């Protein structure tokens, strides 16, 4: 898929998420690089946030880009913000090549922040049943772009 098209689609997805969060009283912030995301003020969100994780291979701290980090108005039991990745695909071939990326991201997040860490995919386009089954087996939830209100069940 053309990266320019994918970037445009991600921008549209993030705009849908911003509108949804703004309507629920959330405030967008740009977080300082040194701020631990667990210390985000409740009711805030940040787009294109680098989240520090420990690299499983090197043991070194590295930054993982996350499309949207949301600190719910009421803290969740895991005391972590909700991490959302915007994903779009035009065909099944593209999704099958990339499906392990999200699982690897979640594994690094869980190695750093604990087994209860969650990653939510915000999907638009073609995602076949095999892709969705794979992500579910890895413990990754998803919400379709046209059903943004389903994020309510994630604690937003």
Q: Where are the regions a protein language model picked out?
A:
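Catalytic core segments in nucleotide and nucleic-acid processing enzymes
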Residues: 35-156
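Short, well-structured beta-strand/strand-turn elements
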Residues: 25-35
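Interdomain/boundary linker segments immediately adjacent to catalytic/signaling cores
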Residues: 1-26
């Amino acid at each position: 898929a053309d990266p320019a098209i994918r970037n445009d689609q991600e921008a549209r997805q993030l705009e849908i998420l911003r509108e949804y969060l703004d309507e629920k009283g959330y405030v967008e912030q740009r977080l300082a690089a040194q701020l631990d995301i667990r210390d985000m003020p409740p009711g805030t969100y940040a787009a294109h946030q680098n989240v520090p994780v420990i690299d499983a291979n090197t043991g070194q701290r590295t930054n993982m880009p996350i499309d949207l980090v949301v600190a719910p108005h009421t803290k969740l039991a895991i005391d972590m913000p909700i991490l959302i990745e915007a994903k779009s695909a035009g065909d099944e071939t593209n999704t099958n090549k990339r499906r392990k990326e999200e699982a690897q991201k979640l594994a690094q997040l869980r190695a750093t922040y604990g087994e209860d860490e969650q990653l939510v995919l915000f999907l638009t386009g073609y995602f076949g049943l095999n892709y969705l089954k794979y992500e579910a087996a890895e413990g990754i939830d998803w919400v379709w772009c046209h059903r943004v209100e389903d994020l309510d069940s994630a604690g937003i």
